[in-house]
Amino acid sequence: MYAIVKTGGKQYKVAEGDLVKVEKIEGEPGASVALTPVLLVDGADVTTAADKLASVSVNTEIVEHTKGPKIKILKYKNKTGYKKRQGHRQPLTVLKVTGIK
């Protein structure tokens, strides 16, 4: 059984026992989080009806908070000597799917 959930502006296909890296979610490691905007559930049959999906939630547990890979940004203007360097690491949360109900 799997489900497609939406969190942090992205969609993820998850099944029970999966580890998923998502945009940062507030909470301590070990805390439970329910991902409610479920878009699709596939069990005995595929369900996409909004009225049936309103009662479905994906239960997860926060494993850890981490950061994504470093992204390097460079602005450069020709002939003026203007250079600007910047970097960014996106904060992420690792979730373990404990159940789909």
Curated annotation (Swiss-Prot):
Q: Name one GO cellular component term.
A: ribosome
* Record GO terms (molecular function): rRNA binding; structural constituent of ribosome
Could you tell me which PROSITE patterns the record lists for this protein?
Answer: RIBOSOMAL_L21
Q: Which domain of life is it from?
A: Bacteria
Q: GO biological process: any one?
A: translation
> So which residues are the signal peptide here?
none
- Which InterPro entries did the record assign? bL21-like, bL21-like_sf, Ribosomal_bL21, Ribosomal_bL21_CS
Which keywords describe this protein according to UniProt? Ribonucleoprotein, Ribosomal protein, RNA-binding, rRNA-binding
Family affiliation: Belongs to the bacterial ribosomal protein bL21 family.
Q: What does this protein do?
A: This protein binds to 23S rRNA in the presence of protein L20.
Q: How the protein assembles, per its UniProt entry?
A: Part of the 50S ribosomal subunit. Contacts protein L20.
NCBIfam families from the UniProt entry: L21
Name used for this protein in its record = Large ribosomal subunit protein bL21
Species: Corynebacterium glutamicum (strain ATCC 13032 / DSM 20300 / JCM 1318 / BCRC 11384 / CCUG 27702 / LMG 3730 / NBRC 12168 / NCIMB 10025 / NRRL B-2784 / 534)
As recorded in Swiss-Prot or TrEMBL, the protein's gene is named rplU
